Design a protein with these regions (language model features):
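A composition/secondary-structure signal for short, hydrophobic, low-basic-content segments
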Residues: 1-2, 547
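ATPase nucleotide-binding head domains, primarily ABC-like/P-loop NTPase cores
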Residues: 263, 382, 388-610
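Alpha-helical coupling/stalk and coiled-coil linker elements that connect catalytic or binding modules
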Residues: 2-438, 445-475, 497-498
Length: 610
């Protein structure tokens, strides 16, 4: 029964992955049995061939040839069949692993997926604060790419989110379309993984594709490629007809072999520097072929496929042609064949010229093709994320600056049974939410929940909300500032630099969505209060929007100065029967209960009653 037929009865992602695991496991068992049977047949035919040679050794040449053909020919056919079965086995094992990983991901276990920790950057405007990269990060939850360029693309999207309504809606449409193509996403990922489409040296390939093709313009190259085979033909014909001695042919032939050593360096450099890297383009060719077979509904996906077109043909053909030309360079490893080909036609020089001609014709398109495949790969990941969360909703992107209205919003990385959902309303510009509350009451989690959902919305993904409407301004946060020993920079100064950056961007007219946690943490209370109050007043003057969490209840008085522009909310800690509890539900107003002294007493620290 086909996967499509099965899907008619499947209602959840968990059912789908379980179904694929069951089907793949059954087929894998069958393939392994076939491999075993073929192995036994190969042994049988090989032994039969040896026996036939011994038995019919004196029976005549034709009988011996016939016996050998009846045994060794099937043996060779079985080798080819065996190789196909092993390739199928690798495909199925990868497919099984991918579906098992997705099933674990649905349970919140992302340990099998790439953390993207190389992208972590404390200086980034928001990625470090929102835990976008690293263990149990948003990147680890989303990234399912099978190409290095795809992985880089997702990281780039997360670090430089979209801020235009039209572009976000086009991305949303593409993610929706991709999320519905379960088999395509699975095949794309399996194919990329099996074929090791991991080009990690894009810049080297870019340099190669953009470098001048000097050999094509060299006169000596043209003369050598035409002259060497022509001279060989003339001398060989002369030797055969008796017009000259065959020794002349042999002497000149060996001279050509020696000369080839002098010019072989260029071929060796091409092979060593780019050979293995360029050969992986074959896997990109297969991914391109797979993508072009689909009929896409989304405009963005149609545009990407249109980019995978050159003179009415698929670039897959050109990439496979390059792969074949590079494979032929490997003939130099066969010493006997190498000597014959070099002496006859300057084979390696000829191959390098063919590769240079390919580069001259297609080189300017190469990076565009790879980047397009990388974007398709990234969209596959976003589509998988959307499919895995059918309860999420696609946000409505507003033209009204500024707006952020969320209903029942939760953190996408928090287990559903532990996730307490809250609303958020920022209806206009300028406008700030001031969030007060006790320690551990949920303020920081609330800020990250807003930040992560805001980012998901701005990269075209569905969000962990019942409903979300937002205006896509540039996100900037200050939640987790740290000391810098290498820069001799204090905690307080590091935060000041971040705040100055925000003010500078606002003065430049940038539209920002600002999320701050506990402003001016590194200074004394009086300074902190005055500085915080003045900073928020400046935000109001600069028409800014955002959310600020604080322990300082005095900031709640700003709502009296800006009754239409600032709103107070809080997370309360409830103390009952000498026990502390948290509801993690957002409430209107300024927090009334603080828990620091209570917790200190619980830990055995003496607190003097007033």
């Amino acid at each position: 029964m086909s996967a499509n037929h099965h899907f008619l009865f499947i209602t959840t992602p968990k059912d789908w992955y379980n179904s694929r695991i069951t089907e793949t496991t059954k087929e894998l068992i069958r393939v392994k049995k076939h491999i075993l049977h073929i192995s036994l047949l190969r042994i049988a035919f090989f032994l039969a061939g040896i026996a036939a040679i011994i038995i019919f050794f004196h029976a005549g040449t034709w009988v011996l040839i016939g016996a050998a053909c009846c045994t060794f020919l099937p043996f060779l056919i079985l080798i080819k069949l065996h190789n196909r079965l092993f390739a199928r086995k690798e495909w199925l094992e990868t497919q099984l692993q991918i579906n098992q990983e997705e099933l674990k991901g649905l349970e919140g276990d992302f340990s099998d997926f790439d953390e993207g920790k190389e992208f972590a950057n404390p200086e980034h405007p928001y990625s470090f604060d929102l835990d976008l990269f690293g263990r149990r990060s948003l990147f680890q939850a989303i990234n399912r790419t099978c190409t290095h360029i795809g992985k880089e693309t997702i990281a780039c999207w997360m670090q430089e989110h979209l801020t235009e309504k039209t572009l976000i809606e086009l991305r949303q449409q593409a993610v929706r379309d991709m999320s519905e193509r379960h088999e395509f996403r699975e095949q794309f990922r399996v194919m990329g993984t099996v074929n090791h489409g991991k080009i990690s040296d894009e810049e080297e390939i870019r340099r190669w594709s953009e470098s001048p093709s000097d050999l094509l313009q060299a006169t000596w190259v043209k003369l050598a490629l035409w002259g060497v085979p022509l001279i060989n033909i003339v001398l060989l014909a002369g030797g055969v007809t008796g017009m000259c001695s065959m020794s002349w042919f042999g002497l000149v032939f060996m001279l050509f072999v020696i000369i080839s050593f002098a010019i072989i360096k260029r071929a060796t450099l091409v092979q060593q520097a780019y050979g293995e890297k360029l050969k992986t383009l074959n896997s990109y060719a297969k991914l391109i072929t797979l993508a072009r077979q689909e009929t896409w509904k989304a405009t963005k996906l149609q545009q990407l496929i249109d980019r995978l077109n050159i003179d009415g043909h698929s670039p897959a053909e050109a990439l496979m042609q390059l792969s074949k030309e590079l494979d032929r360079l490997d003939l130099r490893n066969n010493q006997l064949l190498y000597v014959i080909l070099e002496g006859s036609i300057f084979f390696q020089l000829r191959q390098v010229v063919r590769i240079e001609r390919w580069k001259e014709r297609y080189g300017r398109h190469l990076m565009k093709w790879l980047e397009t495949v990388g974007e398709l790969d990234a969209l596959c990941s976003l589509g998988t994320f959307a499919y895995n969360h059918p309860e999420y909703t696609y946000p409505s992107i507003s033209n009204k600056p500024f707006q952020f209205v969320a209903t029942a919003m939760g953190h996408p990385l928090m287990p559903a049974e532990q996730c307490v959902k809250n609303d958020a309303i920022i209806p206009s510009r300028p406008f700030f939410l001031i969030i007060t509350g006790a320690n551990m009451a949920g303020k920081s989690t609330y800020l990250r929940t807003i930040g992560v959902n805001y980012l998901l919305a701005c990269i075209g993904c569905p969000v962990c909300c019942k409903q979300l409407t937002l205006y896509p301004a540039q996100l900037i946060t200050s939640l987790r500032t740290s000391d810098s020993l290498t820069d001799n920079e204090s905690y307080f100064f590091a935060e000041l630099k971040r705040l100055k950056r925000i003010i500078d961007l606002l003065n430049e007219g940038k539209e920002l969505f600002i999320i701050l946690d506990e402003i001016l943490k590194g200074t004394n209370s009086a300074d902190k209060q005055k500085g915080s109050l003045d900073l928020i007043r400046q935000f109001m003057h600069l028409q800014a929007n955002g959310i600020i969490a604080t322990h300082d209840l005095l900031l709640g008085t700003l709502a009296d100065q800006f009754p239409e522009k600032i709103r107070n909310y809080c997370f309360e800690a409830d103390i009952k029967d000498n026990e502390l509890s948290f509801s993690y539900k957002l409430r209107e107003g300024v927090a009334q209960n603080m828990n620091a002294c209570f917790l200190m007493k619980k830990m055995g620290i003496t607190i003097q009653d007033e």
